[in-house]
């Protein structure tokens, strides 16, 4: 039916002249996307009105997959092919995740980043994360009505270079232009600071599903300065789940190794539900029937849970104390503590934070959404949509020192941790032997003094150094960190001018060949994806047209005679019956038939509206 949809002036959620950019919180447990609409940052919901997308991907045979809620619901029945908490594996080698608590996956021993074998082939954490990011990108484009110019994606402040590079690789694979990687606590501060006009020293306590960050920020007249950052990239809400999981098993006299993978996933799901219930109730039940027929039924009290997880709570306070020392402030100097991450809903966490800082934490912003909202504000700025009064300066820091290996396997730090980014620092080195014409440069990241205790980021060689006596050559090594926290290294021999450089892409990141292969794989499933999208679009349009036609019949059904009304009713019935089906062509045909069958009805309604508007008015008044 030829019905026009007209918005009031200025009421469009995103005016066409704006460049559409979003903020994405790629979380361990849940992910979400937000955008600035009508000058207000808001999280974008899916078709069912749900803002949070579970960070879960299930791979099916023959290239199919389920993402988000559907995958989460099927995790217990197919645990080996359903990847959860993939963020914990980003930028990590097999040796670093082999002991991942109760993970039912088959990890593949491959160079660089760990990979997981599924029924659809071997998948890297980057590929899994890309599925989640692509889903959020599609949600944003559907909601905002146009393509995105880019996204600000948040990462834990304590993510190292390898993990940050892996995140950018995933975004690239998902078809997203990354405007910036933004530290999660900093994003939260942007959302909180701009929303409340806050000034002073603030601590951002960020406990997500898989990572913990503590940042000390100074907010002064639109300047967001990160004074210090600390944390643990292997500590999060999942660890609280696993402690309670082990407790329930111990009480039942069972061991995780003896359980079937589907029972492990089912029990973990029930335990997580009990943990969440304890945030609002003094006790919760865990009731599970295992595949063996055995039943587990236990009552967990809030006090029992608090005692059980106390060691994990204390683990968060270690980086907190360290960050305060680095910032040269005390807990008493902190004006407010912002909580970020769903895990901060636990009373045991809120009580510990309140006790340590001597004040109740700030909880007026949704801890699940605040990071994405801050990222959306930053994305809107970077996209060029800033309006008067929106000026602010963001001064972030690197979480770990960057250095170079020197003789004896020692580390010489070039850029110390908590340096404000972007930053460039240089230092001069010399040759060790007479006649030395080349120098191997090994880039490392970490706080330890020995190379063996730090993370290796890259190696390259500077060749063509003129032969000189040992100590005569002057090699200037420059480290440059961009706003995303990613590193480039340049080396130059001062006498001859020979130079070499490397953009650090860690061994745990992806090479261009890997990206190309993954893109090729995505092309193979593109046809399936497009068919699914076409079907969904056809169903939505059919539903819209049915509802619009029925509303028009209620309002102006008297404009049709009995025969015409019967024809329209039949077309509506036909389309309503086809709409839930999976034949997009049939739905499109029925939609077209109803639209054409109501053209005359639409024209009569238009005539009626015009006559009503002109009734009683003279020609010179029109």
UniProtKB/Swiss-Prot annotation:
InterPro entries: ATPase_NBD, Heat_shock_70_CS, HSP70_C_sf, HSP70_peptide-bd_sf, Hsp_70_fam, ISC_FeS_clus_asmbl_HscA. One of its GO terms (molecular function) is unfolded protein binding. The keyword ATP-binding applies. PROSITE patterns: HSP70_1, HSP70_2, HSP70_3. It holds the Pfam family HSP70. One of its GO terms (biological process) is iron-sulfur cluster assembly. The keyword DNA repair does not apply. Signal peptide: none annotated. Keywords: ATP-binding, Chaperone, Nucleotide-binding. It comes from the Bacteria. Chaperone involved in the maturation of iron-sulfur cluster-containing proteins. Has a low intrinsic ATPase activity which is markedly stimulated by HscB. PANTHER family: HEAT SHOCK PROTEIN 70KDA. Belongs to the heat shock protein 70 family. This is Chaperone protein HscA homolog. It comes from Burkholderia pseudomallei (strain 1710b). The gene is hscA.
